Amino acid sequence: MAKYFLIAGEASGDLHAAALITQLKQQDPKSQCAGLGGDRMEAAGCHLYQHIRHMAFMGFAAVLANLGNIRRNFRIAEQALLDERPDALILIDYPSFNLRMASFCRKQLPGTKIYYYIPPKVWAWKRRRVHAIARLCDEVLGIFPFEPAFYAKYGYRCNYVGNPTAEELSRVPRVPMNPGIPKSIAILPGSRPSEISHCLTKMLDAARAYPDYRIVVCAAPGIDDAFYAPYLREGETLTRDTYTAVQQATAAVVNSGTATLETALLGCPQVAVYHLALSPLIALIRWAQPLVFSIPYFTLVNIIAGRQVIKECVANEFRTELVAAELGRLLHDETYRKEMLASYEHLSTLLGTHPAAATAAAIITSKQRS
């Protein structure tokens, strides 16, 4: 009977870990799972030693304010590992915490195999971490198709198991644009209140430059409709059916993140935006980007494609007039639209529709049996 210990520290990691637990139990029915995570992991059959509500701290200020809680979480995880003595430790994203736990496990439980599912984005920044990941982990299970080649440059191995977003969207029913309703612009302002409050007004103002188009704002799970109300004008719609809204829109304005990839896979031309605080430092950040980051892009669409497919209005370029100008091209330049949609098709081919969690579980269970 295999014992698996999983660590996810954020809501997205909880979601992916839960899918992995389900597959582990299907492929290894007698297995037991414990770890640190959220409600989805618990519902999938994982005994939790700590909940992500006590682990997910966003931003430097939040981390600084919660240093005591973070140290406590390390102690909880370390003691849980020693108590459980699992056959395998499975890490899901959450890099700073998980790399420390990998090091602890390697020293204290040398017989435990370590797997990193959804490894840190070392191809974007903190590239030196690639050596620690390869040294500490028995297998690295990536969700982007370029990751194996990136690791190979350093003499290490990484398995591409599939992309969960592409897998999910391959199952979403396609909804054709309805000629019976006015043409629309979809606004995807993000998933956290802070980023929505920073971005939504400028995103809406850019879309309002085209009054012939209906504006549909896609609400994030867990954020009440009342939060959006002050931003909306008469005739502007709030929806929680994001996938349908995006598929029926002529174009979209999207806050950078997984939503840009979702929008591309749903076939909607888009412009991406991203707010950076501390405006006096924005020019310096842009200048230093090649030194700090290993890639020239912010959005997953452009990173995966290896070139600019969608326009990125980031930092000081995130201005209403620039977003509106790009939106105008998306709405009215048919050649530009077709080129972007063709690039989306190539992107979809690169990602494939591999069942990521099932593939990762198969690798883990096979290695555990060997």
Question: Where would I find each of the regions flagged by the language model?
Answer:
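Nucleotide-activated sugar donor-binding and catalytic core shared by glycosyltransferases
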Residues: M1-S370
